[in-house]
């Protein structure tokens, strides 16, 4: 009787796993159908503000979900290749354009390893209509702190995910499994 879910894949859930493992998918994360076409231009990054021009170049009015991903440095710390950081839906008439603005926060660059830390490295700001349909990108160099890879990472499933991780490898991340869940009794609550 298992009363909890073990997400041993950790940060590699959904599109993050498939991209890191190099596995193709039929419908990438963020995929959607539209009756028109959109063009992305003029990606600008100033300080932590990201702007992009989106134009409806089709013959019909339509909506587009503009998605901003952050491509992480792959220098030893275990991280997805890219992560969704923001999105905005715009509705545009044929020929109409809109400037979409995103603000990057420090947490968009951070990992949790003995607290929130921002690793030094080259990141890429990616803008597109899905995780697989990236239209524009621009590199950003971040000078923060050198975050060493955990000693257990080398050679583990998390360094190069494929298939499923073992519970033993998962324990290295979690330090120990969750406590056994107890059967709930009507009228009782945990603190």
What kind of region is each of these model predictions?
Residues 58-62, 94-96, 132:
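Short flexible coil/turn linkers enriched for glycine and charged/polar residues
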Residues 76-113:
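Intrinsically disordered, low-complexity Pro/Gly/Ser/Thr-rich segments with frequent PxxP/GP/PP motifs
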Residues 105-152:
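Terminal connector regions
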Residues 1-63, 69-70, 120, 125-128:
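Secreted, periplasmic, or luminal enzymes acting at the cell surface/secretory milieu
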Residues 47-49, 97-101, 135-137:
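Intrinsic-disorder/low-complexity, polar/charged segments enriched in Ser/Thr/Lys/Arg/Asp/Glu/Gln
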Residues 150-188:
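Compositionally biased low-complexity segments at domain edges in trafficked proteins
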Residues 61-68, 80, 111-114:
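Short, hydrophobic/aromatic beta-strand segments
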């Amino acid at each position: 009787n298992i009363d909890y879910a073990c997400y041993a894949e950790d940060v590699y859930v959904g599109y993050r796993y498939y991209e890191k493992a190099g596995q193709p998918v039929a419908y990438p994360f963020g995929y959607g159908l539209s009756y028109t076409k959109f063009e992305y231009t003029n990606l600008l990054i100033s300080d932590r503000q990201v702007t992009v021009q989106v134009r409806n170049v089709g013959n019909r009015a339509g909506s587009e979900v503009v998605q901003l991903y952050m491509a992480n440095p792959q220098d030893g710390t275990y991280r997805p290749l890219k992560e969704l950081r923001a999105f905005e839906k715009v509705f545009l008439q044929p020929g109409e354009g809109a400037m979409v603005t995103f603000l990057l926060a420090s947490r968009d660059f951070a990992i949790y390893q003995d607290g929130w830390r921002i690793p030094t490295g080259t990141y890429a700001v990616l803008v597109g209509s899905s995780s697989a349909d990236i239209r524009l990108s621009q590199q950003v160099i971040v000078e923060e702190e050198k975050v060493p890879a955990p000693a257990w990472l080398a050679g583990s499933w998390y360094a190069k995910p494929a298939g499923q991780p073992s519970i033993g490898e998962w324990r290295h991340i979690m330090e120990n499994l969750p406590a056994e869940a107890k059967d709930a009794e009507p009228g009782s609550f945990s603190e």
